[in-house]
Curated annotation (Swiss-Prot):
Protein name (Swiss-Prot/TrEMBL): Beta-lactamase LCR-1
This protein's record includes keyword Hydrolase: yes
Gene (name only): lcr1
Chain positions with N6-carboxylysine modification: K66
Active site, per annotation: S63 (acyl-ester intermediate)
Statement: the UniProt record of this protein carries the keyword Hydrolase: yes
Signal peptide: 1-19
GO process annotations (BP): antibiotic catabolic process; cell wall organization; response to antibiotic
EC number of this enzyme: 3.5.2.6
Role: This oxacillinase hydrolyzes methicillin.
EC main group: hydrolase
Amino acid sequence: MLKSTLLAFGLFIALSARAENQAIAKLFLRAGVDGTIVIESLTTGQRLVHNDPRAQQRYPAASTFKVLNTLIALEEGAISGENQIFHWNGTQYSIANWNQDQTLDSAFKVSCVWCYQQIALRVGALKYPAYIQQTNYGHLLEPFNGTEFWLDGSLTISAEEQVAFLRQVVERKLPFKASSYDSLKKVMFADENAQYRLYAKTGWATRMTPSVGWYVGYVEAKDDVWLFALNLATRDANDLPLRTQIAKDALKAIGAFPTK
């Protein structure tokens, strides 16, 4: 009796996982985009991967590198914390939110490239290869441009590697100070309600065709932490909202993103 019960339970779990995959596949299908998402429970290790071949493929990290870059900058003393001020020099950028002074918190949230280029100059290009290797953050092709490498395709990472990296961030297993983790968590904060807190970063790799949109992060729910990394092929800027929309809908589909 016990054996048959366990078999039935195992079959139920398998069928549920398969249904969840189908539900998530429909999100990408309805949007008409090629993409992948990796979701993992920090507590149980339960994993869901849509489009496994793409999940293994590396793409330019783009602004998702700001997660690691923030930790590096804090550790190196290149910035002091989330209230660090970056003074705008008057250069007019195509993104209006960049055309003003920034704090680290605002720079992270609006993906201010010139702010993080200042950070890269303060850290120094020679420091980055060791940090990237030590944290297993994708692959850095050398030689590289010290203020462009996360944008120009020199630094690439897969969705699977993003989740593995985020796991180490959440568990604080990387060689960074507690204060660095604390500041990163503050700037990564994206949303909350009574059931969850969302920490995340977008990215858009535009120097390739098709361009690639990213959304990576984690959800702190009442009984678990769910890591996720999504990327998708974007046709133009009109596709960018799909990054967060599909990721949130996928997390909701498996119960990782409670809304009530």
